[in-house]
């Protein structure tokens, strides 16, 4: 067996007009580092081609800030095909090719030519040489081998066993003292670090649908907790305002409409607005702020849902609302603030095109404008909150970016970020206590046949597995899957997102595998977002409602990754950064190919429970009440095979008295 790139020069691809391109990421290497970067890229290429490609790669590095190897990108759109159309020696090898191509197709990817799936910087891998080599490896992969991927680089095939993962991925796992944006930027330019975000580098993205259910849950529960909306009502008559219509943030208008709300979503990039308009995810587009609020006001009076895309800056929109005394019920932000100085956040007074020019030629000026805008953004939110608006950070590192811009007033303890910020994140206030602490999270699947009828069958099967009377969350999830087809959520592969707890996920997974076994549907890929109960440690998002001091620890995410590998998930991935940025999160996920076998049933029975309950156990040990109750019930129901350590809770007044008495003695 010999696997390498072929000894011929592919034709340079033609770039399709109208397809978004990533901005210049910035070149800041020393001459010695530049030489290393060039050598790193050329090590994929047969020596005979170096003379031709070295100048080409050098030009990419200087003008794009990365070596993408555009020449090695296949021509045209990389749409995911049915699994039967891929070459491979095992079903997993074929299945992962479906997932990779879906992440990079024009309908899905934010910057397809730069391998960015979503989130401004989330890449499948670093360059097109890696893409081609990964595909070759997946075609050769057998059920007794594991493919190892390190920051996009296919390290090789290694002998394993059928019950081991077929693919193990890590992305940007920086050594501690270098785990920061500056050193990562150097490593990325040199071609040794890939920002996989979550499901981009984890090969499990399902389009903006992947976050619609979570956004729907967040908005609905925000309305119940903060606006007094009854359990059986929705957000009709209320206004939600936010920003961002990209690969993740694009879920906001769709989720708001499903939840019944009127929504205005600001977006500076006209192409992203057009993408959502063509998909039917926004109903109205305007660059007139007054018209945007007028349309929303009419829908609010009629108690009808509406989605409005405002082409402009969110700060302008909010300052207008503040000056006019307009009411906003729910307010958030989903700009890519994990990459706030790399183009993820556009300064006020600057067009999207001007932002791209500033990034390329005047980066310091751009960064100064970003800081200035963040401060204005903070001030206007503060005024709106004082008038009754409920603002929540959507886990995009927005409040951390404000803090880093010099606004230490946003820090809860006035000293640092360890105790969080003055406004809650959506995990802190809503997602954590209402969903994660019970084990509910973003379970998902892809019908690898590509047949819509397979997705419909799985929708019905999943719905039959849910008891809507068990909990309020189950009723919401039942209604979600009942209406999923009607809501036209699919973009790219035939896929579905559905929040479920541990028992629900296992029940659905086993039913799906039976359906594959009995020939009712084709093979299925199971997975989840890394943004889940157990998958991610980040004090700025997923573990922001952990208050025992362990919110800065990443043991949970690493243990989840290792446990899923040990139990035989088809693919396991572990990344640095997630949705909040390098050094601010450790996150992991999995893919599990359902082939109908009894072997897969056994893996599911072990791995699906672990993947969820490891996180519930950690949340319980942090003394989260709902997680403690969930863990106690789990011990009662599954005590023969499992047992979670439960905390004893001392009285707070007793502890306070002990501490104060002891400290007073030392004064």
Residue ranges of predicted features:
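Catalytic cofactor-binding cores of redox enzymes
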Residues: 100-105, 109-113, 186, 192-199, ...
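Structural alpha-beta junctions
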Residues: 140-145, 260-261, 327-330, 383-390, ...
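General beta-strand structural signal in soluble alpha/beta enzymes
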Residues: 146-151, 169-170, 242, 265-266, ...
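Catalytic or ion-translocation cores adjacent to nucleophile or general acid/base/metal-coordination motifs
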Residues: 197-220, 224, 236-239, 245-303, ...
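Core active-site phosphate/anionic-ligand binding loop and the adjoining beta-turn-alpha structural block
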Residues: 290-508
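C-terminal domain-closing interface element
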Residues: 295-304, 309-324, 328, 626-665
């Amino acid at each position: 067996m010999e696997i390498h790139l072929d000894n011929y020069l592919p034709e340079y691809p033609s770039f399709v007009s109208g397809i978004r391109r990533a901005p210049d990421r910035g070149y800041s290497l020393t001459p010695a580092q530049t030489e290393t970067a060039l050598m790193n890229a050329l090590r994929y290429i047969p020596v005979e081609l170096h003379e031709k490609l070295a100048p080409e790669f050098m030009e990419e590095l200087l003008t794009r800030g990365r070596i993408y190897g555009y020449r090695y990108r296949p021509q045209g759109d990389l749409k995911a095909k049915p699994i039967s159309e891929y070459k491979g020696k095992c079903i997993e090898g074929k299945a992962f090719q479906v997932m990779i191509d879906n992440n990079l197709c024009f309908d899905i990817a934010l910057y397809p030519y730069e391998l960015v799936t979503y989130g401004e910087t989330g890449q499948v891998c670093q360059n097109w040489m890696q893409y081609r080599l990964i595909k070759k490896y997946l075609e050769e992969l057998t059920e007794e081998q594991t493919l190892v991927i390190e920051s996009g680089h296919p390290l090789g095939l290694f002998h394993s066993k059928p019950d081991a993962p077929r693919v193990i991925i890590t992305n940007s796992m920086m050594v501690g003292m270098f785990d920061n944006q500056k050193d990562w930027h150097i490593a990325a330019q040199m071609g040794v670090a890939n920002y996989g975000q979550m499901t981009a580098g984890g090969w499990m993205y399902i389009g903006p649908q992947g976050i619609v259910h979570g956004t729907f849950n967040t908005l609905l529960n925000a309305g119940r907790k903060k606006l007094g909306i009854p359990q059986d009502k929705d957000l009709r008559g209320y206004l939600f305002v936010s920003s961002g219509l990209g690969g993740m943030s694009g879920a906001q208008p769709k989720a708001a409409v499903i939840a019944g709300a009127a929504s205005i979503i600001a977006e500076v990039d006209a192409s992203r607005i057009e993408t959502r308009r063509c998909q039917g995810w926004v109903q109205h587009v305007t660059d007139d702020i007054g018209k945007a609020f007028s349309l929303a006001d009419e829908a609010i009076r009629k108690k009808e849902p509406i989605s409005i895309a405002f082409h402009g800056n969110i700060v302008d929109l909010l300052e207008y609302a503040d000056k006019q005394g307009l009411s906003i019920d729910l307010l958030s932000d989903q700009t890519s603030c994990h990459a706030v100085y790399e183009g993820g956040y556009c300064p006020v007074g600057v067009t999207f095109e001007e932002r791209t020019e500033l990034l390329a030629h005047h980066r310091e000026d751009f960064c100064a404008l970003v800081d200035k805008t963040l401060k204005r953004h903070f001030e206007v939110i503060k005024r709106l909150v004082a008038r009754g608006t409920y603002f929540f950070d959507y886990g995009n590192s927005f409040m951390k970016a404000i803090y880093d811009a010099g606004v230490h007033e946003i820090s809860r303890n006035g000293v640092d970020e360890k105790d969080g910020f003055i406004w809650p994140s959506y995990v802190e206030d809503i997602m954590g206590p209402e969903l994660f602490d019970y084990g509910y999270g973003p379970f998902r699947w892809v019908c690898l046949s590509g047949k819509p009828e397979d997705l419909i069958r799985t929708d019905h099967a999943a719905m039959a597995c849910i008891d809507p009377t068990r909990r309020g969350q189950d009723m919401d999830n039942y209604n979600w899957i009942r209406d999923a087809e009607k809501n036209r959520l699919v973009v790219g592969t035939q896929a579905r997102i559905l929040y479920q707890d541990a028992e629900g996920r296992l029940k659905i997974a086993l039913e799906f595998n039976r359906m594959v076994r009995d020939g009712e549907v084709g093979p299925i890929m199971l997975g989840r977002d890394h943004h889940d109960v157990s998958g991610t440690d980040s004090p700025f998002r997923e573990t922001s409602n952990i208050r025992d001091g362990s919110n800065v620890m990443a043991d949970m995410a690493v243990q989840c990754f290792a446990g899923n590998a040990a139990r035989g998930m088809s693919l396991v991935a572990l990344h640095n950064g997630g949705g909040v940025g390098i050094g601010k999160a450790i996150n992991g996920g999995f893919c599990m190919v359902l082939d109908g076998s009894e072997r897969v049933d056994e893996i599911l029975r072990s791995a699906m429970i672990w993947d969820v309950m490891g996180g519930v156990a950690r949340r319980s040990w942090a003394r989260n009440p709902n997680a403690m109750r969930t863990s106690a019930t789990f011990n009662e129901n599954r005590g023969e095979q499992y047992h979670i350590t439960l905390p004893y809770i001392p009285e707070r007044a007793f502890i306070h008295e002990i501490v104060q008495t002891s400290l007073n003695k030392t004064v």
